[in-house]
Amino acid sequence: MFCMDLYKLFLEKKALLEGHFKLSSGLHSNKYFQCALLTAEPEIAEMLCETLAQKLRADKIEANLVIGPAIGGIILAYEMARALKVKAFFAEREEGQMRLRRGFTVKPDDKVIVVEDVVTTGGSTREVMDLVQSMGGEVVAVASLVDRSGGKVDFGVPFYPLLKVNVETYLPENCPLCAEGVPVVKPGSRK
């Protein structure tokens, strides 16, 4: 799938929202990619993750585990793992930190792909990477549906976004939408 096709899909599914949003990173933006509206349709989730898996296979990225941060990375981790025929875990926030729960554990010889729905600053992805490394695993790649940083994020491992866009973000104190008094909406999962 090409970038423009995915962008069109966001538009067709009304999954590219416009307004005033507070992102999981704490930054504000006038656009929000609601990936849940895409992954709610199993055939779309499967197709997107198979496309990501093809990119990883083409570059000979080998892993035995895919981990996604909750909530946006859960379905993606499962579908990526299914496409790659490996296990899928998800990390969830507990007391402000990403943790593996539910009996999930990373072993020292695990090679892990971290998958996320949208990357803005890469904060949640880095938290999962740190978690994997703290348990002795090796992160071999990062994948996402959307890189909205304009290519500015560097994870130190190969990064595979399906869609790269440069969408304006603002610190809350410099946000023109706040200055105009436009109410802010927080559609993401981080509190």
Swiss-Prot record:
The keyword Transcription does not apply. 5-phospho-alpha-D-ribose 1-diphosphate binds at E116, D117, V118, V119, T120, T121, G122, G123, S124. It comes from the Bacteria. Pathway: Pyrimidine metabolism; UMP biosynthesis via de novo pathway; UMP from orotate: step 1/2. One of its GO terms (molecular function) is orotate phosphoribosyltransferase activity. It catalyses: orotidine 5'-phosphate + diphosphate = orotate + 5-phospho-alpha-D-ribose 1-diphosphate. One of its GO terms (biological process) is 'de novo' UMP biosynthetic process. Its cofactor is Mg(2+). CDD domains: PRTases_typeI. It is an enzyme of class 2 (transferase). Keywords: Glycosyltransferase, Magnesium, Pyrimidine biosynthesis, Transferase. Orotate binds at T120, R148. The keyword Glycosyltransferase applies. Its EC number is 2.4.2.10. Homodimer. Belongs to the purine/pyrimidine phosphoribosyltransferase family. PyrE subfamily. HAMAP family: PyrE. Catalyzes the transfer of a ribosyl phosphate group from 5-phosphoribose 1-diphosphate to orotate, leading to the formation of orotidine monophosphate (OMP). This is Orotate phosphoribosyltransferase. It comes from Carboxydothermus hydrogenoformans (strain ATCC BAA-161 / DSM 6008 / Z-2901).
